[in-house]
């Protein structure tokens, strides 16, 4: 084999290697994902909660339409991008006073008065529109805290001894 034929053989062999690389298949990788907004949930202790009011006497209503006020809070745990939480309360109004939530206990003439503890205090009416039954709170440190107060309240007729039992649903929306 002469030295002159070696470059020709190398050129032919190199061409074969290029053809082999060109014969490989190609593809496209596509990546998809979803970026969701943060979420908010009622705090675990507020999902199914019993709030016990202090015992009162019938005579406590002699000079006031309400008695036994008890402060408490309802809160929501939120992710860092949530700025505001709206709490919506829904329950059955009392037949004697539609602003007051119905008492299914044994005491007659009483219902539950729910108040947002602001200055001045603001009743959350059982028979109100959704806007009247809602309160919006800004989040702080990934939490929204709504300060509330509940109390026994006269409805109509004579007040009798017995229990006060009142239930409502709280739902939250957020942004």
What are these regions (language model features)?
Residues 9-17:
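Bacterial N-terminal signal peptides
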């Amino acid at each position: 084999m002469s030295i002159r034929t070696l470059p020709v053989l190398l050129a032919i062999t190199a061409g074969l290697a290029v053809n082999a690389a060109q014969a490989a298949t190609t593809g496209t990788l596509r990546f998809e994902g979803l970026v969701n907004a943060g979420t908010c949930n009622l705090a675990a202790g507020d999902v199914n909660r019993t709030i016990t009011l202090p015992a009162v006497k019938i005579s406590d209503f002699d000079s006031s339409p309400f008695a036994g006020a008890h402060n408490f809070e309802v809160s929501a745990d939120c992710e860092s991008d949530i700025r505001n939480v709206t709490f919506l309360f829904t329950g059955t109004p009392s037949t004697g006073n539609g602003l007051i939530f119905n008492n299914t206990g044994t005491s007659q003439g009483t219902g539950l008065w729910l108040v947002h503890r602001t200055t001045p205090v603001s009743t959350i009416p059982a028979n109100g529109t959704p806007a009247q039954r809602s309160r919006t709170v800004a989040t702080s440190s990934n939490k929204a805290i709504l300060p509330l107060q509940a109390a026994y309240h006269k409805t109509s007729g004579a007040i009798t001894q017995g229990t006060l039992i009142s239930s409502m649903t709280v739902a939250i929306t957020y942004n």
